[in-house]
Each structure stands twice: as C-alpha cells, then as structure tokens.
C-alpha cells in the first residue's frame, strides 16, 4: 500500500525546519553543511524533514546538495511575500490593526513586507514631547532627511536649523496649516531656511491622513494616526534597506501632488 502523503500546507507550514529549509533554498541549491549552519540544526534533526520535502517533490538532493524542484520553486515564490508580510505584522498586530493605513497607495500597501522586522516605540508622557532621538541622531549621520507630516512639532525650527547647518539636505512635505504656523509663529527661522539650498519645503494639496512618516539613510519612522484619526505618541521604527526604498517611494508618491514653497 502506498503511504498517504501529508497535505502540502502541512508539509510547508507545520514544521519550522521544513519551512525555513524551503525559504533558504529559494535563491538556489545549497550544500547540506551550509543548510545545517544557517538553520542551526543537526543533521540528525534536519534530514527527516528534508526527506519529507523530497517525498512531496518539493526538494531534490544529490551528492549532499539540495535544491527546489520546479513545484517547490513555484510554491516558495508565492510563500516568500507572505512570510515577509507576516514578519512585519507578527509581533505588532495590535499597533498595525488599530492605526490608519489608508494613506498608503495600493502598490506600496502590497509591498508592506519590505518594511521588514520593525520595532514599536512606546513613549511615556514626558518623552512624547520630544522628537524620536534615534531618527534625529541618525539624520546627522545622513546626507538627506525626508519628512511627510501633517502637524507642527515645536522642536522643528531648532532641529531643522541644526541639520541644515550640518549640510543635511531636508525635503519636507506638509499641509497648508503647518505652513501657516511656520509663517505666523516662526517666520524668521523658516524664511532663513527657505533661502538655504539644503531646505526644500512642499505643501500637499489634500489631507494626507498622516501624522509623520520620515526617513534618512539609516531608518524609517512611521508615526501613524489611530483608526479613529487621533494622534498617537507611539510609533514604529524600521531599519531594513528595503524599508528605506519603500519610504522613498512613499515620499515620491506624495510629492507628485505637492507644490514647492519658495517663500512664506
């Protein structure tokens, strides 16, 4: 009698060793020793799982080198985006599930996996009055700083001035209300900044549904409104290179419907 095979969903997802082996082989065949080192597994523990993958025609092996079959590659091609998306949400479903994501255009929403493993920053009431120190610190180590914001922070005048003096190029997309605040309460500072080649200010034509999204050469900050549209002091920080590309594309998306501000 031919033994009954497991459903493919169980084969792939019911064992972390099998799932990680498939993902590891996604970019090409690997020697068993490399697989063992990468997965921090013993041969005795891993081989039975590899045999199951072979029995289900997902993996093939020869001379201690293993790779995906055509079926295996097809499935892992679909698996990788899902696993990447799960990694983003896995530890922070409460945050992502209670905050507004409508500001993200569809083509970038489908690529949320590119944010990678972010971390949630929970602030005390005292800390909530400060800008995120990680992004401020790393901006001074960056060539440029990109900000999309719909609210005015009282530290903006001093911090933006310091950044420009350190030759950091600033690109800021904001709302008419924020520009009005700059003009009414901080005219001299922002008039001086606008005369600098390093300070680039844009006003967006519509409501953006964003509290703050900012990135430099090192990290991406997402300070989102709640699902009810309220301001929240807690936020996410992402550090993967892919998250910076994602953040840059989001900035370019909003820049398309923004006009440069050359004078207050």
Where are the regions that the model predicts?
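Basic, Lys/Arg-rich alpha-helical nucleic-acid-recognition elements, primarily the DNA-binding modules
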Residues: 1-87
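Primarily the HKD phosphodiesterase
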Residues: 135-190
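HKD-type phospholipase D/PLD-like phosphodiesterase module
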Residues: 177-211
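Amphipathic alpha-helical interface segments
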Residues: 219-264
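Amphipathic alpha-helical dimerization/coiled-coil segments
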Residues: 83-134
């Amino acid at each position: 009698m031919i033994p009954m095979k497991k459903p493919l969903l169980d084969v792939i997802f019911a064992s972390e060793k099998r799932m990680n082996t498939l993902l590891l082989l996604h970019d090409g065949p690997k020697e068993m020793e490399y697989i063992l080192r990468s997965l921090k597994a013993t041969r005795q523990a891993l081989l039975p799982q590899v045999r199951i993958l072979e029995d289900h025609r997902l993996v093939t092996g020869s001379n201690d080198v293993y790779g995906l079959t055509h079926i295996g590659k097809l499935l892992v091609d679909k698996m990788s985006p899902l696993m990447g998306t799960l990694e983003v949400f896995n530890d922070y479903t409460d945050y992502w599930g209670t905050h507004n994501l409508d500001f993200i255009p569809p083509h970038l929403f489908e690529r949320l996996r590119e944010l990678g493993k972010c971390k949630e920053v929970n602030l005390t009431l005292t800390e909530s009055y400060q800008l995120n120190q990680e992004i401020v610190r790393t901006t001074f180590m960056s060539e440029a700083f990109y900000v999309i914001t719909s609210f005015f922070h009282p530290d903006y005048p001093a911090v933006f001035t310091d950044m420009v003096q350190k030759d950091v190029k600033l690109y800021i997309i904001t709302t008419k209300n924020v520009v009005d605040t700059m003009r009414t309460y901080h005219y001299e500072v922002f008039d001086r900044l606008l005369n600098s080649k390093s300070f680039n200010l844009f006003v967006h034509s519509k409501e953006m549904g964003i509290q703050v999204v900012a990135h430099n050469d090192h990290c991406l900050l997402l300070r989102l409104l709640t699902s009810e549209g309220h301001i929240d002091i807690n936020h996410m920080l992402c550090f993967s290179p892919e998250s910076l590309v994602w953040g840059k594309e989001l900035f370019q998306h909003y820049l398309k419907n923004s006009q440069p501000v050359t004078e207050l």
